[in-house]
């Protein structure tokens, strides 16, 4: 006896199982072989007993609930149930139909042993066959009738063989039980044949399967409709997004084209802005038939007023490279004095050439940036000067000269500069009118030129400054002095020449210097010790004092030559 058999017997005694329950436990054991046909036949005969029937069915349902490693309990329980449905009481098939859901759950039975073999496939196939048999009433009836006939044939064969042996008929239980191994083998072959026939027959779908199929189809249809609606919504949103993107792209392209068109259109003429704060010009309407504006041409608006007070220039022509038309004389604040007009007298230039009587068509005014001429006179002396006296200067009438009788005593001034390059410091023209004592216009002009600062702005009616010459310093009595003899070395007097100096004493010789000079200053007084101490520069003994007297208020003469030995004294007024 095996260990499993001993264990089952111990459990049967402990749990106090009945005879029917013990047979069911034996038929559905965990042994590796199947239940015997004789044991199943005995259990089928016990199903006709009401008490035994309940015990048998409760034990079968308990075995069907096992799982995992007890997969043989489940498989053998379904095999016994199938045999009882075909050969047992009709109450077995009825109770199985009522509890069909327990058999349907076994369609998903899963178990894989240690060797990796799927043992649950046997349980799943057996559950499908049993469910198909319970749902098909006609097949169940045919299978039941065929099993009962086979059972009767087996019983009759067993009865005939037993009658030959014994006189009395065997009991009913003995007829069902196989009497020999050959009969048991025959029953097993019959059961296998019936199982094959059932497996070959196609499973028929019951009403529940149809309902489930319809339900599954409806669910699938609803899912499909839902997915279709979602897909259509996505397509619609995608189409709307594409259209919106196309509209935005079209708008951007249109704006880009408009910007490009604006670039090539004619821009409005800009308003001229004066950097010196001049008034802005009023723009005028451009006529339709006007020509296109030249980008290199003159501005369309009139030029603003000159902030320096100059005359307004005439509008330039449209071509900026065409030479400008001759216009009126422009006032140059840094240039010389412009030439007078034809109807006006020549204006006296205090630092220019003394050519008052020159015609209007004389040489132009000196350019401050042009190279200096060969002859340079810091006091404005001209190389050629007219010797006329009493003429009108600058268009003003002269007063009658009361010393005109002394004109015969004057000598003609040299017509050209000295050949030795001496500066004609006292050369000049005697003006007809002496300047006022408080006239400082010449001093201002001289200071402006000496410092180098720009002259003030031109006044509406400037007073023409008069030139400061030795004649203007001496006044009307300038004709009484021979200026040439004062600044030049006296030459030899020709014999027989008549003396023209009215200040010489009578009876004095015509040649030779005078004995006494009325213009010689008195000798300097001797300074005391306190005066010498307070004096910043002590006087040099034997040297005459230096007197600086500016002529006409002009600046002192700068040194024109490097210092050297002092020139010999040629002043006739000094001893």
UniProtKB/Swiss-Prot annotation:
Keyword check for Isomerase: no
MF GO annotations: clathrin adaptor activity; clathrin binding; molecular sequestering activity; phospholipid binding; transmembrane transporter binding
For the modification Phosphoserine, the affected residues are: 382, 418-419, 434, 446, 453, 472
Q: How is it modified after translation?
A: Ubiquitinated. Phosphorylated on serine and/or threonine residues in mitotic cells. Phosphorylation reduces interaction with REPS2, AP-2 and the membrane fraction. Depolarization of synaptosomes results in dephosphorylation.
Q: Which residues form the UIM domain?
A: 183-202, 208-227, 233-252
Which residues lie within the region annotated 3 X 3 AA repeats of N-P-F?
Answer: 501-573
**Positions of a 1,2-diacyl-sn-glycero-3-phospho-(1D-myo-inositol-4,5-bisphosphate) binding:** 8, 11, 25, 30, 63, 73
Q: Which Pfam families match?
A: ENTH (PF01417)
Return the InterPro entries for the record: ENTH, ENTH_VHS, UIM_dom
Q: Where are the sequence repeats?
A: 274-276, 294-296, 306-308, 319-321, 332-334, 349-351, 367-369, 377-379, 501-503, 517-519, 571-573
Residues covered by the ENTH domain? 12-144
Which stretches are tagged as biased composition: Pro residues? 453-467, 556-569
Q: Which keywords fit this entry according to its UniProt record?
A: Cell membrane, Coated pit, Cytoplasm, Endocytosis, Lipid-binding, Membrane, Methylation, Nucleus, Phosphoprotein, Repeat, Ubl conjugation
- Region ranges (Disordered): 149-186, 264-283, 293-575
User: Regarding domains, what does the record say?
Assistant: The NPF repeat domain is involved in EPS15 binding.
Entries under PANTHER family matching the protein = EPSIN-1 (PTHR12276:SF48), EPSIN/ENT-RELATED (PTHR12276)
- Subunit-level organization: Monomer. Binds ITSN1. Binds clathrin, ZBTB16/ZNF145, AP2A1 and AP2A2. Binds ubiquitinated proteins. Interacts with RALBP1 in a complex also containing NUMB and TFAP2A during interphase and mitosis. Interacts with AP2B1. Interacts with UBQLN2. Interacts with REPS2; the interaction is direct. Interacts with EPS15; the interaction is direct. Interacts with ENTREP1.
Q: What is this protein called?
A: Epsin-1
Species of origin: Rattus norvegicus (Rat)
